[in-house]
Amino acid sequence: QFQPIIGDTTVDIDDIEYPIPSGRVISVLITGIDSRLGEKTARADANHLVRFFLDSGCVEVISVPRSTYADAKFTDPRGQLIGNVRLTLGRDRYMKEIRRVTEVKKIDFFVEFGFSQAMGIIEIMGYKENASSALRVIRSRKVYAAGDKQRSYNQGQFIRQAILRSFDHTDDLMGQLGVRAALALSTTNLSYDAASYILDELRANGFNSNTPDRIWVKMMPKSSYQLKVFDYDSANIANIETSIESKVKNIVGKNDRKNPEYYANIMRSLLAKVEKDTNKPERVIDSLAHPFRQRSWIQIQNVQERISLRDKLCYLLVNAYNKKGKTAEAFEIVQYVEQEDAFRKSGTMK
């Protein structure tokens, strides 16, 4: 019988015998996009196929390291990585490569998010006061002997633990708001109704926050690495981060991105530049449409400034869309801002 891994430990993932559930299954590809604030590139930095076995009440997280080989049409063989397929060949080809590596025939839905969007989603999952620390912890790889494989496994375990921790709250009003907020922050073809259906079916077939034996993390392609398993409880995040920082400071040196003002300064500079171009709506749209899709303001730690810069960005973008007669795009932004404000008022988001 499959025994869940609990607490901080080390495992040889080749020795684990995973359950083989039967019945209906829905597969959702979760992709973390590596694009800096305002950048339009879309390399897949985190790749996790989450399979919901509805009739068995089980969940399988298949984690694929970004360094996994795939034909990304790079002339440099070092660039032939699955993370780069999303960048060079687009989402459909990337999903095909994920199917090949994971040996899964069908992917039903995709959920993609960049750094800022991930911050917001992690806040929703119970890390409201330390989302940036949690994200830093699960993105770190330089301090681990297994490098990228360990990082990918860490992310898979984070997803597993987050599902367990939050699942029992998804059927109350706050939990439903949380699901809506997470979907609103993502680029996805997964609707709220479809997400609710998955959760309801799992619940009806025995899955809950106290069934750790019903959810597990696999690595594909198969590997015999010894991998560490961490407890990602919010209270333990600071301990893990401190351990990483003490090891990594001699490897990478100073990191300005840890400065809370770093992202705020980028946003201020961008908006100051765009404000001079308000009579050129095409230029405003070109400059701000992508930062809006990234939900770039969420990286700003000071909540008042976060909201202030969000409002300015959205105001400029809505006006530009209206000037070009693109009222549907303008309305989408207004609708999102209203949603985010409702999430914040409910306590779902910071």
Question: Where are each of the predicted segments found?
Answer:
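Non-catalytic, solvent-exposed segments at the cell envelope interface
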Residues: 1-350
